[in-house]
Structure formats: structure tokens, C-alpha cells
Amino acid sequence: MLYDDFYVKSLIQTIEDWPKQGISFRDITPIFSDPKGMRMVVDAYVHRYIATDITHIACIDARGFLIAAVLAYELQKPLILVRKKGKLPGKTISQKYALEYGEAELEIQEGAVKAGDEVLLFDDLIATGGTLLAAIELLTSQGASIKEVAAIIDLPDLGGSQKLRDSDIPVFSLCAYDGE
């Protein structure tokens, strides 16, 4: 199905002052309840990545899982879950990163990636880039290389996509919004 930017953007809701005052939250959940919109989004990524040399798709907890799982299925690639600390069973490898007030930690299962793996890293949204940069550090520490970061939404005013590009990581998003 051909991608229609206007249609997909019409599904994304803006919730003002959530999760805190002054933030315009971009809610992608209506895409998941709209089969046409979901198909457009998935097909846009399938067409972009079907003829590439990616070997794995990694995705960030939790909304990144929803599109990435379908994309991994469509492209027949292994899916790597990048989760918050304590959410994965078995042996894990972790990476700490700074938050606005404190620190958080991401994990992948030991052996999820190895040297030579070419990874597409997927998340629902690019904001400040902190979580994505931590996920990149985690995956590359195991020898994988990041081919591209993909997201449904980019908030370029928050600087995350530029930080990724400054780190020589290509970035692709379907929609961009100004402001927070």
C-alpha cells in the first residue's frame, strides 16, 4: 500500500501537557487500531529495508516493539528486544544512560547480537536521543553495527536525530513535528 503522509499524520493524536506541563505528547496508538494506517506504516518500512543487508532488527521498549515485530516478520529477520533493566529473563548485558533526573538502564539478552551483525534499530519516536544512543552503545559493545535508526516520529527540535547523525548513524522517520 502506498504511504500517505497526510493520512498517517491524521491518526497521530497530540495530547497537550502530558506527561507533564508544556509537553505536546505525540500519541501513535491510534495507528494500531486503524488497519489501513498500520499497513501503510509497515509497508513504508518494508519497502525501505527489503533490499538492504540488515541481519537483525532491534527495538526499544515498549511502543517500538509493535511495529518492529511486524517488520521483522515481514522481512524474516531476528528481532532483538532492548528493554528496561529487569524485564528480560536469563543472562543479560546492560547499558546505563542519563535521564533528566537520574539514570536508567537498558538490557539485551546475552548472545542476541554478535560481531558482523548489521542492525536496524527501531523506536516509535526520536526525541533527545538518549535512549537510542544507549541502545546503540549496548548493541555495538557486542560487535554489531547499526545500519540505521528508524522511527515513526522525529521531534528534531529536541536534537536527538542530530545527535545520531553527529555519531554517523543514519536516521529515517516517517513524520516530523516541530516543538516538544
Swiss-Prot record:
GO terms for cellular component: cytoplasm. Pathway: Purine metabolism; AMP biosynthesis via salvage pathway; AMP from adenine: step 1/1. GO terms for molecular function: adenine binding; adenine phosphoribosyltransferase activity; AMP binding. It is an enzyme of class 2 (transferase). Its EC number is 2.4.2.7. InterPro entries: Ade_phspho_trans, PRibTrfase_dom, PRTase-like, UPRTase/APRTase. It catalyses: AMP + diphosphate = 5-phospho-alpha-D-ribose 1-diphosphate + adenine. Gene3D superfamilies: 3.40.50.2020. Keywords: Cytoplasm, Glycosyltransferase, Purine salvage, Transferase. GO terms for biological process: adenine salvage; AMP salvage; purine ribonucleoside salvage. It is found in: Cytoplasm. Its main location: cytoplasm. Transmembrane segments: none annotated. The keyword rRNA-binding does not apply. The keyword Isomerase does not apply. Belongs to the purine/pyrimidine phosphoribosyltransferase family. PANTHER family: ADENINE PHOSPHORIBOSYLTRANSFERASE. Homodimer. Catalyzes a salvage reaction resulting in the formation of AMP, that is energically less costly than de novo synthesis. This is Adenine phosphoribosyltransferase. It comes from Marinomonas sp. (strain MWYL1). The lineage of its organism: Bacteria, Pseudomonadati, Pseudomonadota, Gammaproteobacteria, Oceanospirillales.
